[in-house]
Design a protein with these regions (language model features):
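Catalytic center-proximal scaffold of phosphoryl-transfer enzymes
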Residues: 1-328
Length: 328
């Protein structure tokens, strides 16, 4: 899916159907809104039942979460939160990747992601590794929706704290700083994390050193990368980062793009369904759902009109308050 103008031109080229970009935008917004509501209803059903009805194979899985920024017209930059789930195997990359996303708060994201979590059997899965950065809202999501998961701090994220501490201590671009960083990065990945924390502790005190030391110490159980790799666990969250590039930013973060929130949310919903390879099954629900919603709105308007209508009614056809109506 691309910009509405070129998309309208492609539609005419391949099908002969002429449609203005404004009409295509309106229809896309309507479809996206409907798809989002369908997914919300499914998430509500998962919340009620605690899972999905069909059996889901209990295979090793990775779950990663991250955010990227989308520019909204009236709200400025807002974070689009994305969940990526994939099956782990002996070979990389992950297989059967699927996603869930929203522009809402962390709580709203948790509610809307329940559907995909249920489809993939995450609440009942026995072997889930979650690789993320250390953001509190992400850890809260895992606490609530996948407490049994093995937690790994994204290695590149952890190494970034070491790089910042090295720059603050040795100066930017210095050979000493580069050598210290390379050595500690290697030790963090292949050796003992306690040695890395000790190396940080002996650096001269600075805000960057203290931040790195406190951050990694608080996540000590999530940085045992040598042990994780020995178990065959992933230590990077590239699946969700590439998901942001392909699913979210590939459409919503172009040059000069600013979005109305409903349009952005609708596009995200459509792109998620497409990326999850459920376009055909979901689209089959869109038409019936839109017709049902239209009937419900029509019935509601009819009820309102009847409630507002005067209680007086003519006794027979053709009679009004002013006398008989004669079509002369």
């Amino acid at each position: 899916m691309g910009p509405f103008g070129p998309a309208a031109a492609l539609l005419h080229w391949f099908t002969g159907v002429r449609m203005s970009p404004a009409t295509l935008r309106r229809l896309t917004l309507a479809a996206g809104t409907t798809v989002r509501q369908i997914e919300r209803d499914f998430s509500a059903a998962v919340r009620t039942t605690g899972g999905v009805a069909e059996a889901v194979a209990d295979v090793p899985r990775q779950l990663s979460i991250d955010g990227s920024m989308v520019h909204l017209r009236t709200e400025g930059w807002r974070e689009a939160k994305l969940l990526a789930i994939g099956n782990r195997g002996a070979e990389w990359p992950l297989t059967a990747l699927s996603y869930a996303a929203t522009l809402g708060t962390a709580a709203a994201f948790g509610d809307e992601a329940l559907g995909e979590l249920g489809r993939r059997g995450i609440p009942q899965a026995s072997d889930v590794v979650t690789v993320n950065d250390g953001a509190e809202w992400i850890q809260g999501f895992v606490d609530l929706h996948c407490p049994q998961a093995h937690r790994v701090l994204d290695f590149a994220h952890a190494a970034g704290y070491l790089a910042t501490a090295a720059t603050a201590t040795f100066g930017e671009g210095t050979d000493a700083g580069a050598a210290w960083f390379r050595g500690q990065r290697r030790e963090l990945r292949d050796g003992d994390p306690e040695a890395v924390l000790a190396a940080l502790a002996v650096l001269p005190a600075s805000e960057a050193r203290d931040t790195a030391l406190d951050y990694l110490t608080a996540r000590r159980t999530q940085i045992a990368y040598r042990d994780f790799r020995a178990r065959g666990w992933p230590i990077g969250s590239g699946c969700v980062e590439s998901g942001h590039k392909g699913v979210i930013q590939g459409r919503l973060k172009g040059r000069g793009m600013r979005w109305a929130r409903p349009v952005a949310e609708g596009l995200i919903a459509l792109r998620i369904v497409n990326a999850n390879d459920r376009w055909t099954t979901t689209w089959a629900q869109v038409g019936p759902r839109q017709r049902a919603d239209h009937r419900a709105r029509t019935a509601a308007r009819r009820t309102i009109r009847r409630a507002r209508a005067p209680s007086w009614r003519p006794r027979w056809p053709g009679w009004t308050r002013c006398g008989p109506f004669l079509p002369i």
